[in-house]
Design a protein with these regions (language model features):
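Phosphate/pyrophosphate-binding active-site segments
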Residues: 1-5, 285, 289-382, 499, ...
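Structural signature of the thiamine diphosphate
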Residues: 25, 68-77, 83, 93-97, ...
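Alpha-helix C-terminal capping segments
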Residues: 40-44, 61-72, 87-102, 233, ...
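N-terminal cofactor/phosphate-binding cores enriched in small/glycine residues
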Residues: 6-91
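Active-site diphosphate/adenylate-binding microenvironment
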Residues: 11-22, 29-33, 37-42, 342-423
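Glycine-rich, acidic loop regions that bind phosphate or pyrophosphate groups
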Residues: 104-152, 240-343, 445-446, 468
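Glycine-rich, anion-gripping cofactor-binding loops and their flanking helix/strand elements
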Residues: 85, 213-296, 304, 393-423, ...
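Thiamine diphosphate
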Residues: 103, 110-123, 129, 389-596
Length: 596
């Protein structure tokens, strides 16, 4: 018979990943919902197959094979009570840490509980039967395929992690009758490694290497040195934002470069290898702008975190040990990639346009004036985004609540930190919604004079009015319910003033650049004062949106400035055309479209 693989994407991906992870032994029990899988397996000579009618016996046979070979074994059966006969053998495997992958075929899970024949609920499994269980739905779209690939990779890796043990995949199949697919799809195998597999560690690929750091505890001196040495040895760059906690020699704040909406750079943003450490990042610009061909994740939790959809290896180990392992004992100092990034960043900063009074403008005035040794906390999302555009002093540490990424506790987190070191200044920058959500916290009796809070008050959630956000298409109507405008005194000039002063705060405010310049020195005074300070800045929502958009188009802005100036001195657009002619206009445009 001229039969090959089933024309089902889920089945094809599963087979391809079994082969990629070198899992070849299979015990198959008869059935219909697992038929497309079994028929595909038996069509591929890679797989070493055995048949067993009794699923209970099949599970115990798998225990014997796994124990004898020290290698994983697949068992597969159909739905209904066939799968109920696996748990006794899988329980044996669980307590002996035997690597058995149980694949149960199933109809669509929407049929569960609706009196369909041979459909039972396998969504809840006893704790000591398998280490991990996942449901794989039928795969239709590329996004489905990505998720199927990811979940199967997770399942296969759980066979081996932390001593290993049995794993369950509940596979939705389609009763397909087409078995004419003669090749398997290309898949991305994800391999989880730890100290026990150090001999299997891959070599660093050739090409450009970047370390991407999400939110992270402040780096210890030892970790900083390990990262610095690694970057120096491999001409790598450490891409960070204001929550990354790394202040070493190879730090690169890429937020301004990454946010340029019209920029056309060469390959500075293309990484042949991205080493991902830390947790959730608020640097949306770098997240979206970077091209990562290959990602390695380094974390002591060993979990698969495929944020960039390019993950191939997970290293379950300390970051220090990882960077030391991949750093040779002797190396030459290399900074070419870092200098290339810095040069381009400096070129964009030289083009930054004048912007209105706003969170971004305030950040541009204060980022380099924060006192040495101080600490600053940001609210999400507009505040952290605005301040990420600037390079804080290396001895000023910064944080934001990007774990849960809510606006509800930023002030409290900043205050909690301030309780620990009364001799250090703690700054906070929060939008009005974030501050008022958490405003009760500043009445806590432990609040000290080392606290400085800035409230950017534009009377609404600015995020929903920025040009890139869906909410912005509603204009002012967004304020009704989308952006929650008009609450908390509707930008009252006295509400927060009275509240803060009654709690013992020194209150200052500004509604424009001139007022700001007259009072900001009080806010960044490097000396401890007799009372905490609250600085309220009243901004306009359109100014906020326009300021951010201008900075995100700084690379374009210089071109527009030149064009407008040339038009002005030429006496108008038509006069310029008359002077230059068609060829001159074309040449002029070519020059202006060039990028640094």
């Amino acid at each position: 018979m001229n039969k090959f693989y089933a024309n089902e994407r889920s089945v094809l991906i599963l087979l391809a990943l079994l082969k990629a992870h070198n899992i070849k032994r299979v015990i198959a029990s008869p059935g219909t919902t697992n038929l497309s899988l079994v028929a595909s397996l038996q069509s591929d000579p890679f797989f070493e197959m055995y048949s067993c009618v009794d699923e209970r016996s099949a599970a115990y046979m798998a225990c014997g094979i796994a124990a004898e070979t020290g290698e994983p074994v697949v068992i597969t059966c159909t739905g209904a009570t066939a799968s109920r006969n696996y748990p006794s053998g899988l329980t044996e495997a669980y307590y002996r840490k035997l690597q058995i992958l149980a694949i149960t075929g199933t109809q669509d899970e929407t049929k569960i509980g609706h009196l369909h024949a041979q459909v039972i609920d396998r969504s809840v499994i006893p704790n000591d039967v398998v280490r991990y269980s996942t449901h794989i739905r039928a795969t239709y779209t590329d996004e489905d395929a990505y998720y199927t690939e990811l979940k199967i990779n997770q399942a296969i890796n759980e066979l081996f992690r932390h001593g290993g043990g049995p794993v369950h995949i509940n596979l939705h199949t389609l009763y397909i009758r087409d078995f004419h697919v003669n090749s398997l799809p290309a898949v991305r195998a994800i391999h989880c490694l730890d100290y026990t597999k150090i001999d299997s560690f891959p070599k660093l690929p050739k090409g450009r290497i970047g370390v991407f750091v999400g939110s992270h505890a402040t780096f210890t001196p030892e970790l900083t040195m390990a990262v610095d040495n690694f970057c120096s040895a491999h001409d790598a760059v450490c891409f960070c934002d204001n929550t990354s906690g790394y202040y070493g020699k190879y730090r690169m704040n890429y937020a301004l470069l990454g946010s340029q909406e019209k920029a056309e750079y060469t390959n500075i943003n293309v990484l042949d290898l991205c080493i991902h450490i830390g947790e959730i990042s608020a640097d949306y610009a770098t997240l979206g702008n970077m091209v990562r061909k290959n990602v390695w994740r380094v974390s002591e939790d060993g979990e698969i975190r495929d944020q960039f959809k390019k993950l191939t290896y997970v290293f379950e180990m300390s970051e220090i040990d990882f960077f030391k392992y991949y750093t040779p004992d002797e190396f030459d100092l290399k900074r070419d990639y870092l200098m290339e990034c810095q040069k381009l960043d400096e070129a964009i900063r030289a083009r930054l346009p004048e912007i209105p009074f706003s969170n971004v403008w305030i950040a541009s005035q204060l980022y380099d004036k924060l006192p040495s040794g101080s600490e600053i906390h940001f609210g999400v999302l507009n505040s952290i985004r605005s301040w990420n555009l600037f390079n804080l002093p290396r001895d000023v540490h910064s944080f934001a609540n990007v774990g849960g990424f809510g606006i509800d506790g930023g002030v409290s987190s900043m205050l909690g930190a301030s309780f620990i070191n009364h001799n250090r200044l703690y700054f906070g920058v929060f939008g009005d919604l974030a501050f008022f959500y958490d405003m009760n916290s500043i009445g806590n009796r432990h609040v000290g004079s080392n606290v400085r809070i800035m409230v950017i008050n534009n009377g609404r959630g600015q995020e929903f009015r920025n040009h890139y956000h869906t909410g912005s298409i509603f204009g002012k109507d967004a304020d009704k319910y989308i952006a929650a405008g008009g609450h908390f005194g509707n930008m009252s000039k006295t509400l927060l003033k009275d509240y803060a002063e009654n709690l013992g705060f020194t209150y200052i405010s500004a509604s424009d650049k001139e007022e700001f310049k007259n009072v900001y020195a009080t806010f960044v005074n490097p000396n401890l004062t007799d009372s905490p300070i609250l600085f309220e800045c009243f901004t306009d929502t359109d100014d906020e949106a326009n300021a951010l958009k201008a900075y995100w188009n700084a690379d374009k802005d210089i071109k527009n400035t030149i064009i407008n100036k040339v038009i002005e001195v030429s006496g108008g657009k038509q006069a310029l055309r008359n002077v230059l002619g068609p060829r001159g206009i074309k040449f002029f445009r070519t020059i202006l479209n060039k990028r640094t």
